Every structure is written in structure tokens, then in C-alpha cells.
Amino acid sequence: MGLSDGEWQLVLTVWGKVEADLAGHGQEVLIRLFKNHPETLEKFDKFKNLKSEDEMKGSDDLKKHGNTVLSALGGILKKKGQHEAELKPLAQSHATKHKIPVKYLEFISEAIIQVLQSKHPGDFGADAQGAMSKALELFRNDMAAKYKELGFHG
């Protein structure tokens, strides 16, 4: 299930584009997540009151959280699968405090792929999409394993 060196290079190359505007990309990812899967919004007390896409686009808190999400994910991706130290506290908080089901990690992975496709079509062709999908699946599988260790079956 691991990625080849070439696949990791594709992932990290496109991630460099994301890092040029983490907050903007993160905001778009969260907006897409909430639009495609409105039930996910219920997990975010801070954002439950945001009903329209315009309200979401105008929310500094949403932009800040998008930055936080993609910053954490970037730190994990840069470890090229050797992300145990980064993953453990993330899994702990998402399982015990926030109670985010693994299914929602799939939903946000889809949103990330969609945002990258729309914002970076020239840098996110089929090979890069395949590599990113594999990297995000590895992340989700490892999060799910940590959840299980913590006794969370979300």
C-alpha cells in the first residue's frame, strides 16, 4: 500500500502549490466538504451557523481552520508514510475529543482531490491524482488503526 519515491514526489510537488496559500486552499476544501456532505458541519460548533457558501467564504474562522487542517496534513504527507509521531496526537483528538468518523476523513479526502483538480489542473494530472489518492488512503487507514487502538469505532 506504500507509495513509490516517484509517487511521493508527485504528491509533494502539488503540495508545494497548496502551501503557497494554505488558508485559501483549506477554506475551499472545507466549503466543498460542507456542501457535498452537510452532515459533517454538525461536528464543527464554530461553523454550524454558516448556512450559505457566501457566509462560509466570509468566515475568518473557517479560513483559519482550513489553514490548520492543511498544515497538519502537509506535515504528515512530508513524512512519506513515516508519520507515526504526527498521526498519534491527531488521531487522539479526532477520536476522543471531536469524535470524527473515518468516513468523514474519506469525505475530506475527496474534497482535497476536487480542490486540487480545480485549482491546479496543470500540476494535478492522472498520475498526481492517483498518487495523492494513495497518500490520503494511507493516512486514513493509519488514522483508522489509531482510532481502533483508542477504542473509537467511528
Swiss-Prot record:
Keywords: Cytoplasm, Heme, Iron, Metal-binding, Muscle protein, Oxidoreductase, Oxygen transport, Phosphoprotein, Transport. The keyword Metal-binding applies. Its EC number is 1.7.-.-, 1.11.1.-. The modification Phosphothreonine is found at residue 68. Its main location: cytoplasm. It holds the Pfam family Globin. One of its GO terms (molecular function) is metal ion binding. The modification Phosphoserine is found at residue 4. The keyword Ubl conjugation does not apply. This is Myoglobin.
